[in-house]
């Protein structure tokens, strides 16, 4: 008798695994961005912002954009319009998050140059 583990597996359409991974990274980046905006604009605790991890965050966002772009290319090959729409939406959200993060970093650099 073989012992078989019961493992729940997700079956995504072709290309949706990359899109799902990009969506999870988007939510992670959104949480970090909201925390940094809160520390920068509301509480003025600049030392609690994620300055030390800027390179890692930007690299992670570029990887997320690449995964979303590859997922949208796979979704374009399918006939399903919903998969294509969701993949392109996630790609646009990741691109917008990248530019929001970049603008926040430039604002923080400008503030540090003026006040320190």
Swiss-Prot record:
It is found in: Cell projection, Cilium, Flagellum membrane. The keyword Transmembrane helix applies. The keyword Nucleus does not apply. The chain crosses the membrane at residues 17-38, 52-72, 85-107. Residues 39-51, 108-116 are extracellular. Keywords: Cell membrane, Cell projection, Cilium, Flagellum, Membrane, Transmembrane, Transmembrane helix. Component of the CatSper complex or CatSpermasome composed of the core pore-forming members CATSPER1, CATSPER2, CATSPER3 and CATSPER4 as well as auxiliary members CATSPERB, CATSPERG, CATSPERD, CATSPERE, CATSPERZ, C2CD6/CATSPERT, TMEM249, TMEM262 and EFCAB9. HSPA1 may be an additional auxiliary complex member. The core complex members CATSPER1, CATSPER2, CATSPER3 and CATSPER4 form a heterotetrameric channel. This is Cation channel sperm-associated auxiliary subunit TMEM262. It comes from Homo sapiens. The lineage of its organism: Eukaryota, Metazoa, Chordata, Craniata, Vertebrata. The gene is TMEM262.
